[in-house]
Amino acid sequence: MKYKDLRDFIAMLEQQGKLKRVAHPISPYLEMTEIADRVLRAEGPALLFENPIKPDGTRYGYPVLANLFGTPERVAMGMGADSVSKLREIGQTLAYLKEPEPPKGIKDAFSKLPLLKDIWSMAPNVVKNAPCQEIVWEGEDVDLYQLPIQHCWPEDVAPLVTWGLTVTRGPHKKRQNLGIYRQQLIGKNKLIMRWLSHRGGALDYQEFRKLNPDTPYPVAVVLGCDPATILGAVTPVPDTLSEYQFAGLLRGSRTELVKCIGNDLQVPARAEIVLEGVIHPNETALEGPYGDHTGYYNEQDYFPVFTVERITMRENPIYHSTYTGKPPDEPAVLGVALNEVFVPLLQKQFPEITDFYLPPEGCSYRMAVVSMKKQYAGHAKRVMMGCWSFLRQFMYTKFIIVVDDDVNVRDWKEVIWAVTTRMDPVRDTVLVENTPIDYLDFASPVSGLGGKMGLDATNKWPGETDREWGRVIKKDPAVTAKIDGIWEELGL
């Protein structure tokens, strides 16, 4: 099923009993987090809060959509897949696009033509009139306090925009970048843009500043659009492909865009709400603290201020929001689903990898478990280094455990068995110092710089040990088959 906009997706979820409308008055201050957290942990439906209320008890004018991607199945639906397992096919497509192989012959070349044709036919379609510009607030009418922006945790410093798709463009790029960066509300037309220095939006901004140090930098933030575009912004799309183009591929139809009223950036035409504005040179503000996906409040730091010059929206717009906290939360669920996309990407580069798993308890990306077909001494260490360096998404992964392909990486009992029986803590532990680390990781000795640990829990080969290696106990297949045949008679 393909969805042309967020409302289309909501309608399908509701039809299938996967969305619940909440008519009771609920406050964005803490209450929505409490409800959404309980529902997510119970693997419950998406939530549409129809009557969000302000601190004075009056009603906001717009409903709030929460827990949209609260199950891996809904993530798969949003990406146009029939099931979570089908996400591997999307990963295979991305792997091919990242490093296309020369055709092995005429037949192979023709077999690839439909995919390539589909991709390049998915260039966005720019329209002149769009639903997202049905209502326009400008000048003094711009008031972010009229939006039901969620205040997620008791010690959060202020309300926080959490699901905004930030649209930027570098000075030498035709391709626009989509990124999701949290934004602290500090005034009726002011948000703090918390993007880390390595992220696409920050890189675009830095390049612009070098060439135009005294010129305001145009930015747009999209709140609520079709699921393919939202999920395209968190998927490792090859640099040669725009997120809008990838969203069209997922959706099976071109992404409709419209030019912003106040700048040349293009935004999804059927988005619910769009914030247009600029970042003025050298205007920064102290951001945080906020509770984040680690389950802790993070430290404060200075980030650019986004001045909102214009708010455009659909008639009766829906505000899309989430919270982040100790796993499981929505980012952790997204990690579980997108894990299936990552596997083919890694296997393209390292065919010896048989499976890859990001445990949700590891805050989406901080720990990975990899299984492989080991072929030589030191092979596991090569795979560790490859995982850390191949995809930007794993640059901040602190721990990698490598096991043989007889171990199920998604079963902690098996992983712990391999670690405790196939590892020597000194010989098989790899420590790397002074590597890039998530700014939110307060455990690192220096902000943004810390260590990594690799655990080689594979069987050891000659050159790695001189000792006789243990043989795994296996049952006799004939006896197993015999007992299977009489099991019901035994009454056990």
Swiss-Prot record:
Residues the record lists as binding prenylated FMN: 180-182, 194-196, 199-200
EC number(s) reported in the record: 4.1.1.98
Keywords, comma-separated and alphabetical: Cell membrane, Decarboxylase, Flavoprotein, FMN, Lyase, Manganese, Membrane, Metal-binding, Ubiquinone biosynthesis
EC class: lyase
Pathway this chain belongs to: Cofactor biosynthesis; ubiquinone biosynthesis
Gene3D superfamilies listed in its UniProt record: Single helix bin, UbiD C-terminal domain-like
Catalytic residue positions: 292 (proton donor)
Any one of the GO BP annotations: ubiquinone biosynthetic process
Cofactor note text: Binds 1 prenylated FMN per subunit.
GO molecular function, one term: 3-octaprenyl-4-hydroxybenzoate carboxy-lyase activity
Cofactor(s) the protein needs: prenylated FMN; Mn(2+)
Catalysed reactions listed for this entry: a 4-hydroxy-3-(all-trans-polyprenyl)benzoate + H(+) = a 2-(all-trans-polyprenyl)phenol + CO2
GO cellular component terms, semicolon-separated: cytoplasm; cytosol; plasma membrane
List of residues binding Mn(2+): 177, 243
Membrane topology of this protein: Peripheral membrane protein
Pfam families xrefs: UbiD, UbiD_C, UbiD_N
Protein known as: 3-octaprenyl-4-hydroxybenzoate carboxy-lyase
Organism: Neisseria meningitidis serogroup B (strain ATCC BAA-335 / MC58)
